[in-house]
UniProtKB/Swiss-Prot annotation:
Keywords: Ribonucleoprotein, Ribosomal protein. This is Large ribosomal subunit protein uL30. It holds the Pfam family Ribosomal_L30. Part of the 50S ribosomal subunit. GO terms for biological process: maturation of LSU-rRNA from tricistronic rRNA transcript (SSU-rRNA, 5.8S rRNA, LSU-rRNA); translation.
Length: 159
């Protein structure tokens, strides 16, 4: 049984953000621009937080192959150590990042509750830049807000 997972990326800073929005971004663990987190879509309260911060973030459903690449390239262990195949074998009993991504998607490993992996990923700005305005919603020709499967192409440009 695979669960729907949201990859949430912060795309704007916060100088003019309302205090409620700042607190929401903090609760989502999106403390800096280009930080990303992965949460199950059915997490209680997540929809409200996404709606409140939608002008500062973009999100969508992540694919298994993209999650595996994100863990391999940008995943960090406590102490800011890079994730290695030996480390994930010791902590999770899996042989590859693809197997770990499969366990996360199936709900056997809950990424935001893990102590063995940092709960956020620090990304680069997208290669080639944002194609549209970060001030407008995605459905209106911008970059912010819900974007569905298109989040995968964006995050691959940010690794």
């Amino acid at each position: 049984m695979s669960k729907k997972l949201y990859l949430i990326i912060r795309i704007k800073g916060e100088p003019d953000a309302h205090p409620d929005v700042r607190k929401t971004l903090e609760n989502l663990r999106l403390l800096r621009r280009y930080a990303a987190v992965v949460y199950p879509a059915d997490l209680p309260g997540l929809e409200g937080m996404l709606r409140k911060a939608q002008a500062w973030i973009t999100w969508g459903e992540i694919r298994k192959d993209v999650l595996a690449k994100l863990l391999e390239v940008r995943g960090r262990a406590p102490g800011d150590k890079k994730l290695t195949p030996e480390y994930i074998k010791e902590k999770f009993g899996v042989n590859s990042f693809e197997e770990l991504a499969e366990k996360i998607i199936n709900g056997e490993v809950v990424l935001h509750k893990q102590e063995a992996i940092k709960p956020f990923f620090r990304l680069h700005p997208p290669r080639g830049g944002f194609k549209k305005s970060i001030k407008k919603p995605y459905r209106s020709g911008g970059e912010a807000g819900y974007r569905g499967e298109a989040i995968n192409e964006l995050v691959l440009r940010m690794l």
